[in-house]
Swiss-Prot record:
Pfam entry (one): Ribosomal_S19
Stored PROSITE patterns: RIBOSOMAL_S19 (PS00323)
Keyword RNA-binding annotated: yes
Name of the featured protein: Small ribosomal subunit protein uS19
Gene Ontology terms: biological process: ribosomal small subunit assembly; translation
SUPFAM superfamilies: Ribosomal protein S19
GO cellular component, one term: small ribosomal subunit
Cystine bridges: none
Family statement: Belongs to the universal ribosomal protein uS19 family.
UniProt keyword terms in alphabetical order: Ribonucleoprotein, Ribosomal protein, RNA-binding, rRNA-binding
Superkingdom of the organism of origin: Bacteria
Amino acid sequence: MARSVWKGPFVDGYLLKKAEKVREGGRAEVIKIWSRRSTILPQFVGLTFGVYNGSKHIPVSVNEDMVGHKFGEFSPTRTYYGHGADKKAKRK
């Protein structure tokens, strides 16, 4: 189920402060965040966030198409190695 419209998007408070500080400074740096559950807001466009995936920070450059999505969608937590080879074909 989607979040109620009257509640508005969820964003951790520290995330807004960090983004504002980088905007004021005018320097392009990666903002390290652990809040995968936060929604990407329009004021984050153009910034680069390091989203934690459980082992390291994955750099995510925010563009207009990402607004409204969650940060966690762009930082996968699992590595896919593919399905195992066919054991019957291997024996022959």
